[in-house]
Amino acid sequence: TGYLRDTAVTATAMDLDDQTAGNYVAKWEASFNFDHKQVMTLLDQINYLGAHNATTAGEIAQSVNSAASMGQIAGVDPAATAAMATAMQATGVATDRVGTSISRIYTNLSKGSNATKAQKEMWEELGFTAEGIAKSMQTDGVGTLKEVFTALQDMPDERKVAALSTLFGQWAIEGGAKITNNLGAYEKALAMVSDPSLYTGSMEREFIIQASTSESIDTMVKNSVTALKQDIGT
């Protein structure tokens, strides 16, 4: 079936085990309220990011699996979450901390009137209000993120750590600092997921290169069937 082949393509292109690939293909529809085609587009975007940055598609997918649902609530689509994960991983943030960092950033940007007194004061120091940022995230999440990180980048160096700590919390300081100091890497990754001419067919191309024999395709499809059966409990 299409699902089985798509799982095989995903596993091969991203160098994932079949069960992990099957989980992404099957479960991201419910997680992100996507149809199957949207899931495969997101996986193409992630695969392209992994091929063109100092990280891997598998690591990016792991962070997306962890943080993208929170991103959607905060006003950021999963592809943009993938771009942020890419920028953090490519600048040295450990993969197992990236998802948490991104989730904390999204949560803190969305607090609005629930922000702490210290956060409200820090937002004002940056030229924003906590309520304004929360509203802005809902209308243009990516634009708001870029605006916030640019403002942080423009702060005097001696204020940056305090600002990152106050606004994002200790668990997200490193990730926030990496984006602030490497805004170009984040913008480059965003540009990649915004251009269908770059990422469309990314996994299929990789799959064709690796699965050049009918024997290897048969093996991959059999493995995918096994993984899917385990996943749905048959």
Description of each model-found segment:
Residues 2-52, 59-66, 77-234:
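Alpha-helical architecture feature
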Residues 53-54, 71-74:
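Short coil/turn linkers that connect adjacent helices within long alpha-helical scaffolds
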